[in-house]
Regions:
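Extracytoplasmic entry segments of secretory-pathway proteins
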Residues: 1-85
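Extracytoplasmic beta-sandwich strand-turn segments characteristic of Greek-key/jelly-roll folds
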Residues: 2, 6, 120-143
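Histidine- and aromatic-enriched segments that form or immediately flank copper-ligand environments
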Residues: 82-86, 108-133, 164
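Short, charged beta-strand/loop "edge" motif centered at a coil->beta-strand transition
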Residues: 91-98
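Short tyrosine-centred short linear motifs in exposed loops/low-complexity segments
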Residues: 102-103, 141-147
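Short, charged beta-turn/beta-strand-edge "cap" motif at the junction between a beta-strand
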Residues: 111-115, 143, 155
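Short, exposed beta-strand-loop hairpins at the edges of beta-sheets
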Residues: 152-160
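Interdomain boundary/hinge segments at the C-termini of tandem beta-sandwich modules
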Residues: 166-170
Length: 172
């Protein structure tokens, strides 16, 4: 560091500088033109109002029950093109969604109590779920099967048990 830079050191510093400029330009371009971002809308809501919407949704479209982590939850199948609701509350994703492959849905996600992380595995879709906000993502399932929802934001003692499910069936 106390001697003048040699030819190799100047070359590597130039490469590093050009790479930094390239990445600085590419980050915003990739954000807008890449296909990796989940298209979302966000609305203010109250936990009570959102809970009422979820309960009305479950009451209208329940088709059965399933067990997740020893808890019986309703399985809800809304018609394609409709709004579907999922609620995060202390250590539970509610209800279990049943969707059709190849059909578009507007998925509403909110929390009633704490900040949670919505992680749909193995697809690896990740969203932060915060009380007071209704996050709406337009989704189209591309493969059939059972997918697991994991909370990836520590939400206190029962965090490790916060698992939900999305069932995607073949088109009718």
């Amino acid at each position: 560091w106390w001697k003048p830079m040699g030819r190799m050191e100047k070359s590597w510093l130039t490469v590093a500088f050009v790479w930094c400029v390239f990445l600085t330009v590419m980050m915003p371009l990739w954000y807008f033109y890449g296909k990796q971002n989940v298209p979302t809308e966000t609305y203010r809501t109250s936990p009570a109002d959102y809970g009422a919407k979820v309960n009305a949704f479950v009451e209208q479209y329940t088709v059965g029950e399933d067990i997740v982590n020893g808890v019986t939850l309703p399985v809800v199948a809304a018609p394609p093109g409709s709004d579907v609701y999922i609620r995060a509350s202390t250590w539970q994703w509610y209800p279990i969604l049943q969707l059709e492959k190849g059909q578009e849905y507007r998925l509403h996600i909110s929390s009633l109590d704490l900040q949670h992380g919505f992680s749909l595995q193995p697809v690896n879709i990740n969203l932060q779920v915060i009380p007071g906000y209704d996050y709406v993502a337009t989704i189209t399932p591309t493969s059939a099967g059972e997918f697991t929802i994991v909370c990836n934001e520590y939400c206190f003692v029962g965090h490790h048990t916060m698992v939900g499910k999305v069932i995607v069936t073949e088109e009718k």
